[in-house]
């Protein structure tokens, strides 16, 4: 928390702490948004939720233990190829940077840097801004894609009404747009939008946005529900799915028929049971619909909660609806 506070102003906090840093430069405003999962390793869901929206990583290491290995494996599975490890040994600990490098390479994080000694928060912020700029240049134009906005939290605000908060994963959202909330299939209208505490007319891909909604039942909102454009087919509901499973780094366990698993994707955490296995091909029947992007761009991690110390089984690819 101390390291994160040095990089940005602490905002809302539940099972994820958020930090924001704004500064003026060249006549404009630059913004960094940082998320820090809490309760890990006791609970893995906050870490997975952060990875659903993260573009780069900062991993502070106080000791080389199983939770660090799990975090590295999850980062590798999520394709977070840009990042830094900050070595900050706990009292009495000594951490070998060479061993950290070996673990990073094994986790698929070979491009990550390792930082030791006193960390300069100004240099770290400049590095993060640089990463942000590079990612914006190299990323495809997701603003022109269909709207996908997973909801992280929601509440009622006096004088405003129902507000949903989440990250715009693709597309854009404007005031007065008609939207649909899945899986409830309820339709409402955007009353107003806030990004970084500022009222805006449009929220774009990558923005953490507060969406005030009217003509919508509060019961239709919950963590992991999706806001999209009615009828555009951006998301497909899966009652059961087949996929290829690429085992996570450091994962020694294999799935068996009947195993209970969770799928983590776009802030969803959907439980299911393995009903078919053939080599690396897996079939899972979901307890409730798992919403997958129609264009095939969903990033899905398969998790087994009792597979400690490495609960991330791996990354699913070639996702197909079987029911």
Task: Give the residues covered by each predicted segment.
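C-terminal effector modules of nucleic-acid-centric enzymes and ribosome-associated factors
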Residues: 1-16, 66-67, 77, 81-114, ...
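Switch I (G2) and immediately adjacent beta-strands of P-loop GTPase domains
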Residues: 5-63
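Conserved mixed alpha/beta catalytic, RNA-binding, or beta-rich assembly cores of soluble enzyme
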Residues: 26-29, 38-39, 202-227, 254
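Well-ordered alpha-helical segments embedded in enzymatic catalytic cores
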Residues: 42-46, 67-74
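Residue-level "contact hotspot" at macromolecular interaction interfaces
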Residues: 50, 172, 202-204, 220, ...
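ATP/nucleotide-binding catalytic cores
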Residues: 50-51, 55, 68-69, 76
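Residue-level marker of beta-strand positions
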Residues: 56, 173, 178, 208, ...
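Conserved catalytic-core segments of large NTP-driven translation/proteostasis enzymes
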Residues: 107, 112-220
